[in-house]
């Protein structure tokens, strides 16, 4: 069935990419042994992912990625009708043709909401550099009821400018290693700010 194949394609591309969407597709797939080998996987910041599966170019991403590759899509009005609130469309194209569309809904995380509220009340704003091609300022403002200006998601040019500043260095003036939740990460930042 085409939808089963669509899930295999999408899960295969996402299996080694996009942490926020990976499990959605892997859970739809169910049997991880069905993941296909992906050659030359590439992230296109803010747009999606490209790779080759069984000698076919597979694109998983947003409208902008599909337009960059000349994939014919439903009208923008159709997309806007199906993406109210925190819903977003994920497009899958195979060999240059639209193969499937997935609608995903983003939900607020209570721990993240509490941390964002704490940051906002202390007068801090947040800059986000995200692997999720659907993540934008409007989505975060809506999901977390944030006022305009409380959060900024980096665009492609800003992401590229930040790369040298955020690259790993063998030695630096200060750093924080973080392997936990977003809430604990921000807790570490607040502790560092309080110690300064």
Task: Indicate where each model-derived feature is located.
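ATP-binding catalytic core of ATPases
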Residues: 2-45, 67-69, 76-78
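Short conserved beta-strand segments at catalytic cores or DNA/RNA-binding microdomains
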Residues: 15, 88-95
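ATP-binding glycine-rich phosphate-binding loop
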Residues: 41-48, 64, 82-85
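Conserved ATP-binding TGD loop and adjacent catalytic N/P-domain core of P-type ATPases
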Residues: 53-55, 94-196
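Surface loops and adjacent helix of pleckstrin homology
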Residues: 62-63, 70-72, 104
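Helix-loop-beta junctions that constitute the ligand-sensing/allosteric loops
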Residues: 84-91, 124-125
């Amino acid at each position: 069935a085409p939808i089963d194949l669509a899930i295999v394609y999408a899960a295969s591309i996402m299996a080694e990419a996009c942490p926020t969407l990976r499990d959605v597709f892997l859970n739809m797939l169910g049997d991880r042994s069905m993941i296909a080998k992906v050659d030359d996987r590439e992230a296109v910041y803010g747009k999606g992912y490209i790779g080759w599966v069984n000698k076919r170019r597979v694109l998983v991403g947003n409208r902008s990625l599909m337009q960059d590759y000349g994939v014919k899509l439903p009208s923008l009005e159709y997309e806007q009708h199906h993406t109210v609130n925190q819903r977003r469309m994920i497009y899958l194209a195979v060999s240059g043709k639209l193969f499937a569309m997935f609608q995903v809904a983003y939900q607020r995380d209570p721990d993240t909401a509490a941390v964002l509220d704490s940051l906002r009340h202390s007068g801090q704003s947040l800059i986000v550099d995200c692997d999720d091609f659907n993540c934008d300022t409007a989505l975060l403002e809506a999901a977390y009821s944030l006022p305009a200006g409380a959060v900024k998601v980096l665009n492609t040019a800003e992401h590229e400018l930040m790369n040298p500043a955020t690259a790993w260095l063998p030695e630096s003036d200060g750093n924080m290693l973080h392997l936990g939740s977003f809430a604990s990460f921000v807790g570490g930042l607040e502790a560092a700010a309080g110690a300064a």
